[in-house]
Regions:
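Hydrophobic core of transmembrane alpha-helices in multi-pass small-molecule transporters
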Residues: 21, 102-118, 220, 295-308
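C-terminal transmembrane helical hairpin of 12-TM major facilitator-type secondary transporters
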Residues: 271-312
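C-terminal ends and interior cores of transmembrane alpha-helices
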Residues: 84-99, 279-291
Length: 403
């Protein structure tokens, strides 16, 4: 606790964490909000899954590219442009009704994905410039816990609004977060103080670094599993009561507690696999016992591993690339997670249509098993950060010597 207390006393840390959290909050709401909105209109989880797939394609194309643009044109211009376009597309989805065809919803989802603001790569690049080397790993842990508010509490809010108001309400609230949170983050002084150097490497080269690729793949599988779990919980209880929101809130609490409790533990090469295994065990048990009480207990257990696993991913990437490549590297990792959020919901939707709600938990367990196995098989590509600085490697270049 004292570690996090001193960290939050560091100038600007609390403000930038909160601002980026609000700006990124739509990422946790929109997948499930789109799923419920399109499913209600067209009465098909499959149709909703197609819209989410289109959104994920847009995110896949744009994520690393817009992150790299920040090193060329600066963070603020890129964030302003993408936030504006994304907001327009998201509001258009919310205004869609029975006369709006699935292909039109898909086109709007694609545009929203293409314009997804690169807030995560921006803030991950700023962090090492705000704190000393000893504070960086706890900062990643604190940030990972905050991110779980996005991924887990976001769907709770989307579900509550869909039940109490209308499925479009969750989408419109997400648009409000896009505007308000985006403006707050963009106005942060740190965005003016930190300049991302232009990378000297070709686009995509950083993804070829084994630690970055490993973190991208495992992050994709982890968030896909979380989205499948969320869709499964909604399918179990439907839109007619508060139970789904309660279960997802318990899932969120588990993640927050896990992130804060385990965030100080040094990161070893096996840390990623171990933390993925915690989530796998909880999810597998939830797939067997789906009564309200047992589902809550087992998803709490699964949640305990989520934020710690994400903290490992962030630290592995930060310690494995040069500063000029950090934005693009985090762009790839963030894209993997966003695609996972969309495709996890989409896959779960198709399975729910075919086999019922339990199928979504089976899908999630399979994704987590794959993630844990990959993390274990390639643990040598996860650096040993016990007693080591988790900050990025400095950029170096030849220096002219006057003789």
């Amino acid at each position: 606790v004292s570690t996090y207390g001193s960290l939050l006393k560091t100038r600007g840390v609390g403000r930038i964490i909160t601002a980026q959290l609000v700006a990124r909050f739509p990422g946790g709401m929109l997948s499930l909000a789109f799923l419920m909105h399109v499913e209600r209109i067209h009465e098909s989880y499959g149709a909703a899954g197609l819209v989410l797939a289109a959104t994920s394609i847009g995110q896949a194309v744009a994520g690393p590219l817009t992150s790299r643009w920040m090193g060329v044109w600066g963070m603020r211009p890129v964030l302003i442009l993408t936030s504006a376009v994304c907001t327009v597309a998201v509001v258009a989805v919310a205004l869609g009704d029975a006369s709006t065809s699935v292909p039109v919803f898909m086109a709007l989802g694609l545009l929203a994905g293409l314009a997804n603001p690169p807030v995560q790569p921006a803030v991950r690049t700023i962090y090492p410039k705000m704190v000393n080397s000893k504070q960086l790993t706890p900062l990643f842990s604190l940030d990972a816990s905050a991110q779980e508010i996005i991924w887990v509490l976001g769907p709770v809010i989307a579900t509550f609004l869909a039940i109490q108001v209308d499925t479009s309400a969750g989408i419109l609230v997400a648009a409000a977060f896009l505007v308000g949170g985006g403006a707050w983050f963009i106005s942060s002084p740190e965005l003016g103080r930190v300049r991302i150097p232009r990378s000297k490497r070709r686009f995509g080269v950083v993804l070829g670094r084994p630690p970055v690729l490993l973190s991208t793949i495992v992050g994709f599988l982890l968030i896909a599993a979380c989205s499948a779990i969320e869709a499964g919980v909604v399918a179990v209880y439907g839109h007619g009561g508060p139970e789904a929101g309660f279960v997802l809130a318990i899932f969120a609490v588990g993640s927050l507690i896990g992130g804060l409790a385990l965030g100080h533990i040094p990161i070893s090469p096996w840390a990623m696999a171990r933390r993925m295994t915690i989530i796998l065990v909880g999810t597998a048990l939830a797939a067997v016992w789906m009564q309200f009480a047992w589902l809550s207990v087992f998803l709490f257990l699964a949640g305990v591993g989520i934020a710690p696993a994400l903290a490992v991913l962030f630290a592995v990437v930060s310690s494995s690339v040069r500063f000029s490549d950090t934005a693009e590297a985090y762009g790839w990792v963030g894209t993997g997670q966003l695609i996972g959020a969309a495709l996890g919901s989409a896959a779960a939707g198709f399975v729910i249509d075919a086999q019922g709600a339990q199928g979504a938990f089976v899908v999630a367990a399979a994704l987590l098993a794959a993630g844990a196995a990959i993390a274990a098989a390639f643990h040598r590509h996860s650096p040993d950060l016990r007693g080591r600085d988790a900050g990025p490697m400095p950029d170096t270049e030849p220096v002219a010597i006057v003789t």
